């Protein structure tokens, strides 16, 4: 702006009414600096305004040495020591700075207030940021930000490295130029001085006032405007670039939240260095001798080399090397026996514990009870004897029941268990009824094993019979006392004394003959002396002192088992020790289950069954075999272990038996060629396991060298469609004992022509199978001699052929009979007579002494003097 009143005055003014005055050169204020991670700091800031120096063009000449003064920082604070009245000097000096107007002061105060408010907000935001970082979400956010910061720092480091590399190249070029300059300076020192001065202060640099610092406007961004006098053009001067800062040290160690928030940049050990140190320490430790670890190695009956090495924590190569020293060439997967494994383990310094697969059954049975916890129990009495000697009738009389009428054919074919209460003592007695037939030997043996007392029933009119002797042997094998009950004394031909005498031959000496065996004469029909029999049983039980613990887990024996279509597998169990309760987990043979229901012999549902109580148990997975021992286990896992072991043993046993019987294919074919043995295929289904066992035993006895009964499948339960399919494949017959075929199975059998036979008496079944097997036997051929004839002359007839004229020398000759042609006592032909004529008539028979003509079928080599022997062959059917 130009003042029209004073054209020569260069003083700036805002309005014509006011003159500009020079304000104090230094202004003080406070500024709050913000650092990373929420740190702030309040500092005092001094601001120096720019001084404008007016005048003509020549006035700039004295200001030329200003750069030399600008390099000294001492005169920076010189204006502060000036008195305030220096600003009121006359305008003759020509230098007057403008003062701020009221609007500018207001705007400046408002800007400072806004800056303070902004600083306060930034401080609060930093505190909130710090609190957020301390929280869980803040920590995660901080980790992400730290990762971004690491990325940016890495990029910045790369950029600075590139910048440093570029500057190093420039510096090298500069040094090369300085060396050239030094060479030139040796020739022209004045020129070098001028060059140095020109380098320190470029020509045309702005003149600075003595009181203004050289870096007063270093913070200003952008080019500075410098006046060069009236009429001088202002040109921008670019600020010198700051020198490159050294690249920050490489971040070492893992960057965590703590290191990211820490203010100090601490140099730490790198992760790679730490890992190298750890590896060195491990290497030193591996060189040290290790202490041998002695382990307890569990060795089963058979074990692989790999498994043995794993259990010993040894290398399998070492185990193989030891075996090779013993002369055994083995692989890592080979199986060795327990003795070899024990030798290897002991040689390597380990202790050995031998186990067997049968160890799973340890603690299952025969647990010794404490004598203080035992209580008296009821005796178990087994009634044994020959068939039709009145065993079941005697039990019916004791139980006041009628079981005999329910048995097919009036004979007992099932083993039964019942409880009877003694009328005098009120104590219960458990009776087991066994079949007396020869087929039920296994049932009688089972009854003898679980019993305490054996009642041997002998008919007074029949005496000792084969099954009576067998029952005596079972009782002796079980080492149980015997009470002889001589039944049917009501008959007229009863001879009790003969029975007592016959028993002496088999080691049974009754008390009346000086022995210790009790005998009672009873009559089941008239109920004679039944109370005396019960009294003798109770007395014998007192002598045995039968006691057991009722609170222990139950043990027992499966008397009988069957597969009921409505109830599933049902087992008749005699509890021998402990108490069996509903819900117990039980194991019997290869079958397991949980007790769902307990049913007494009277059909009453029970919640528990104590010792000597026979019950039907529902809940098995499958029907167990009769005679299996039953036990209660603590868990299903233990039950599965026991049953899997028993099933494995059962499979191995059956496989070995089958392989032993079958042999090789060549042996079987040669046997068929030599013996011509035939099989009679059968599928047998029975109601209970005991009956099935008796049937199989009886059929095995029917086999001979020529024919045998081949049992394709035998099981408990009804006849199913799978049985019919199996029978169709092998052309077998199906036999059902006290069972029936399902509706679908019966229809399939009728459609495919499969024969199904039903039986309820075991002897009828055995007899029919015996007849059918007899039909497979080759019949017996028997020759009957008829007579001999001598050939007198041989005639050749064109229509008939050669005809021999003969005389019957012995017996008779019949047409159609078998003949032999004997020449010189050698049979040269066997065949049949085709023609027998006497004179010209065909006759059926020619008697001795008569002449006749005979011709053979398909044979004509006959000569005079040959003898014709005539005989008849009879076929006789064989039977087993």
Swiss-Prot record:
Region of interest: G3: 433-436
Protein name (database record): Translation initiation factor IF-2
GO cellular component, one term: cytosol
Positions that bind GTP: 385-392, 433-437, 487-490
Similarity remark: Belongs to the TRAFAC class translation factor GTPase superfamily. Classic translation factor GTPase family. IF-2 subfamily.
PROSITE patterns in alphabetical order: G_TR_2, IF2
Region (G5): 523-525
G1 as annotated region, ranges: 385-392
Main localisation: cytoplasm
Gene: infB
Annotated region described as Disordered, given as residue ranges: 1-251
Biased composition (Low complexity): 58-79, 184-215, 233-250
Keywords, in A-Z order: Cytoplasm, GTP-binding, Initiation factor, Nucleotide-binding, Protein biosynthesis
Biased composition (Basic and acidic residues): 115-183
Domain tr-type G: 376-547
Recorded GO MF terms: GTP binding; GTPase activity; guanosine tetraphosphate binding; translation initiation factor activity
Region G2, annotated ranges: 410-414
Listed InterPro entries: EF-G-like_DII (IPR053905), EFTu-like_2 (IPR004161), IF2_assoc_dom_bac (IPR013575), IF2_II (IPR044145), IF2_N (IPR006847), P-loop_NTPase (IPR027417), Small_GTP-bd (IPR005225), T_Tr_GTP-bd_dom (IPR000795)
Region (G4): 487-490
Annotated compartments: Cytoplasm
Purpose: One of the essential components for the initiation of protein synthesis. Protects formylmethionyl-tRNA from spontaneous hydrolysis and promotes its binding to the 30S ribosomal subunits. Also involved in the hydrolysis of GTP during the formation of the 70S ribosomal complex.
């Amino acid at each position: 702006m130009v003042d029209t009143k004073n054209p020569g005055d260069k003083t700036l003014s805002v309005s014509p009414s006011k003159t500009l005055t020079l304000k104090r050169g230094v202004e003080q204020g406070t500024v709050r600096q913000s650092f990373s991670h929420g740190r702030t700091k309040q500092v005092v800031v001094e601001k120096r305004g720019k001084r404008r120096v007016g005048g003509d063009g020549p006035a700039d000449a004295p200001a030329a040495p200003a750069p030399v003064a600008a390099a000294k920082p001492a005169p920076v604070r010189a204006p502060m020591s000036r008195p305030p009245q220096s600003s009121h000097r006359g305008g003759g000096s020509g230098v007057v700075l403008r003062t701020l107007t009221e609007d500018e002061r207001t705007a400046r105060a408002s800007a400072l207030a806004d800056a303070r408010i902004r600083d306060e907000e930034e401080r609060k935001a930093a505190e909130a940021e710090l609190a957020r970082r301390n929280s869980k979400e803040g920590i995660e956010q901080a980790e992400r930000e730290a990762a971004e910061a690491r990325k940016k720092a890495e990029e910045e480091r790369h950029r600075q490295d590139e910048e440093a590399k570029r500057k190093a190249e420039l510096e090298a070029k500069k040094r090369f130029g300085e060396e050239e300059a030094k060479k030139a300076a040796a020739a022209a020192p004045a020129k070098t001085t001028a060059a140095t001065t020109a380098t320190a202060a470029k020509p045309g640099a702005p003149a600075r006032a003595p009181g203004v610092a050289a870096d007063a406007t270093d913070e200003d961004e952008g080019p500075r405007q410098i006046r060069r006098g009236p009429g001088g053009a202002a040109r921008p001067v670019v600020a010198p670039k700051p020198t490159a800062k050294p690249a920050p040290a490489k971040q070492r160690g893992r960057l965590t939240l703590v290191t990211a928030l820490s203010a100090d940049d601490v140099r730490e050990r790198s992760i790679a260095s730490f890992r190298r140190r750890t590896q060195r320490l491990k290497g030193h430790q591996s060189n040290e001798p290790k202490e041998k670890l002695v382990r307890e190695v569990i060795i089963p009956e058979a074990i692989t080399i790999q498994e043995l090495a794993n259990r010993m924590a040894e290398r399998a190569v070492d185990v193989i090397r030891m075996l090779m020293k013993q002369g055994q060439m083995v692989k890592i997967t080979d199986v060795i026996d327990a003795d070899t494994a024990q030798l290897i383990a002991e040689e390597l310094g380990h202790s050995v514990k031998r186990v067997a697969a049968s160890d799973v059954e340890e603690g299952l049975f025969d647990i010794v009870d404490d004598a203080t916890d035992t209580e008296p129990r009821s005796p178990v009495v087994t009634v044994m004897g020959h068939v039709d000697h009145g065993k079941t009738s005697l039990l019916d009389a004791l139980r006041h029941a009628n079981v005999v009428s329910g048995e097919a054919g009036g004979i007992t074919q099932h083993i039964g268990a019942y409880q009877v209460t003694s009328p005098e003592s009120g104590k219960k007695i458990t009776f087991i009824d066994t079949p007396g037939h020869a087929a039920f030997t296994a049932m009688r043996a089972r009854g003898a094993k679980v019993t305490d007392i054996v009642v041997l029933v002998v008919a007074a009119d029949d005496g000792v019979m084969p099954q009576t002797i067998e029952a005596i042997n079972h009782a002796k094998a079980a080492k149980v006392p015997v009470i002889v009950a001589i039944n049917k004394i009501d008959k007229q031909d009863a001879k009790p004394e003969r029975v007592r005498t016959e028993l002496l031959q088999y080691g049974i000496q009754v008390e009346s003959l000086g022995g210790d065996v009790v005998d009672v004469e009873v009559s089941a029909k008239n109920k004679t002396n039944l109370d005396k029999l019960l009294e003798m049983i109770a007395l014998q039980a007192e002598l045995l002192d039968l006691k057991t613990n009722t609170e222990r887990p139950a043990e027992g024996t499966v008397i009988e088992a069957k597969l009921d279509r409505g109830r599933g597998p049902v087992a008749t169990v005699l509890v021998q020790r402990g108490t069996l309760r509903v819900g117990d987990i039980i194991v019997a043979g290869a079958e397991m289950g949980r007790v769902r229901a307990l049913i007494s012999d009277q059909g009453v549902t029970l919640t528990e069954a104590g010792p000597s109580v026979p019950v039907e148990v529902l809940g098995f997975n499958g029907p167990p075999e009769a005679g299996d021992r039953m036990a209660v286990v603590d868990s299903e896992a233990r039950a599965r272990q026991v049953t899997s072991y028993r099933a494995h043993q059962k499979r191995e046993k059956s496989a070995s038996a089958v392989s032993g019987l079958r042999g090789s294919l060549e042996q079987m074919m040669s046997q068929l060629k030599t013996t011509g043995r035939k099989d009679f295929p059968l599928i047998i289904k029975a109601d209970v396991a005991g009956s099935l066992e008796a049937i199989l035993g009886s059929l095995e006895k029917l086999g001979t060298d020529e024919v045998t009964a081949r049992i394709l499948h035998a099981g408990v339960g009804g006849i199913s469609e799978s049985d019919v399919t199996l029978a169709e494949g092998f052309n077998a017959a199906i036999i059902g004992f006290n069972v029936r075929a399902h509706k679908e199975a019966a229809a399939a059998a009728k459609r495919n022509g499969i024969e199904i036979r039903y039986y309820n008496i075991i002897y009828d079944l055995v007899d029919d199978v015996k007849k059918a097997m007899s039909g497979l036997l080759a019949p017996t051929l028997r020759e009957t001699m008829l007579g001999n004839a001598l050939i007198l002359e041989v005639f050749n007839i064109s229509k008939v052929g050669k005809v021999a004229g003969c005389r019957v020398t012995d017996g008779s000759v019949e047409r159609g009979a078998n003949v032999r042609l004997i020449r010189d006592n050698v049979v040269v032909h066997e065949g049949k007579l085709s023609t027998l004529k006497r004179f010209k008539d065909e006759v059926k028979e020619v008697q001795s002494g008569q002449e006749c003509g005979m011709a053979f079928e398909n044979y004509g080599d006959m000569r005079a003097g040959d003898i014709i022997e005539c005989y008849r062959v009879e076929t006789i059917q064989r039977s087993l």
